[in-house]
Amino acid sequence: MKAIILAGGQSERFGAPKAFAEIDGKMFYEQIITVLDSMNMFNEIIISSNETLASEFKGARVIVDDSEHKNKGPLSGIYSVMKQDFESELFFVISVDTPLITAKAISQLYQFMVEHVIEDQLDIAGFKEGNHPIPTIAFYSPNCLPIIARALESDDYSMRHVYQQTASDWIDVSSVDDDTEWYKNINYPQDLESIKK
């Protein structure tokens, strides 16, 4: 099983590449790698990024977004990795702007996926907050690849376009016994400052 850290966004709202922002003395991407490594669950951690940032990452393989689909958001990153590593039975996808992710949350989501993958033939299992799916903290089956490819060819390359066309299910973030905001995106500098307090 492989993990994909999505780190190719423009970070316009944040003002600088979020992957290299720091929390607790580690860059966001390093923090996520540390959590993923600690689980002994993934045989490879891959960073999906763009040509500009690719050489800046250390400690993980980097796959640059496919040239024909660059600048098409998270789907482009997932597609670019899946296309090269189609043999993997499952991919865990995490956005780099979610640096507070915990091993406990990932383990619980994995258990949910395993329990439902055969009976419900799930292709995507992720978290949701209330009624809002969080497709950038989710497990994806390689069966999603053709649907992602079609979405990227269309003029709607939103994550919703994919998960509404696949067998997907979501568990609420409140089901994880953890009172931190481990699932929160850091979109603005003030988001990071509020976490550091």
Curated annotation (Swiss-Prot):
One of its GO terms (cellular component) is cytoplasm. GTP binds at residues 6-8, 18, 65, 97. It is found in: Cytoplasm. Gene3D superfamilies: Spore Coat Polysaccharide Biosynthesis Protein SpsA, Chain A. GO terms for molecular function: GTP binding; metal ion binding; molybdenum cofactor guanylyltransferase activity. Keywords: Cytoplasm, GTP-binding, Magnesium, Metal-binding, Molybdenum cofactor biosynthesis, Nucleotide-binding, Transferase. It catalyses: Mo-molybdopterin + GTP + H(+) = Mo-molybdopterin guanine dinucleotide + diphosphate. GO terms for biological process: Mo-molybdopterin cofactor biosynthetic process. Its EC number is 2.7.7.77. Mg(2+) binds at residue 97. Its cofactor is Mg(2+). SUPFAM superfamilies: Nucleotide-diphospho-sugar transferases. Belongs to the MobA family. Transfers a GMP moiety from GTP to Mo-molybdopterin (Mo-MPT) cofactor (Moco or molybdenum cofactor) to form Mo-molybdopterin guanine dinucleotide (Mo-MGD) cofactor. HAMAP family: MobA. The N-terminal domain determines nucleotide recognition and specific binding, while the C-terminal domain determines the specific binding to the target protein. This is Probable molybdenum cofactor guanylyltransferase. It comes from Staphylococcus carnosus (strain TM300). The gene is mobA.
